[in-house]
Amino acid sequence: GRNHQGRLTAFRKGGGHKRRYRVVDFKRSSFAEAEVLSIEYDPNRSAFIAKVVDTQGIPHYILAPVDLKVGDKVESGPNVPIRIGNALPLSSIPVGTAVHNIELKPGYGGQYARSAGTFGVLIQKAPDGKYAQIRLKSKEQRLVPLNCMATIGVVSNPDHGSIVISKAGRSRWLRK
């Protein structure tokens, strides 16, 4: 890649197809219930995204978990059922559940487990009622406040890492 002076700044990178950025809702607090309209490819991330429309008719993009289908309902809030694609506070999620799009600070939006095929497992909830322990895909264990949100399920496109690019030109198209 080259900067405004024409000099190489990112070596061995360049070209690539033009991309339109899709604004993905990582907070999941702007709507309570929505219906999945479509599952779409996003050139800006490794996972697929789902286009959902809420009860007011406003469309949003969310990270698509594995097994989410067109027509499914997704909800967010403290009292929603444990179903794939639903976003809940960690205090409402049972121990042993696979979650993704995990917040680190309440209200900041999901920061962990957003890449294709990733998830964290809720290992335990602290007896003091303040923190939950989550094991990430890297086997790292993190303490996260119980009032942080997480989405049920595994992020879509788990085969992303096994895709064979097969030629230099395709790698260039993908800006890799």
Whereabouts are the PLM-identified features?
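Beta-strand/loop nucleic-acid-binding surfaces
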Residues: 57-69
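Structural recognition of beta-strand segments within beta-rich domains
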Residues: 44, 52-54
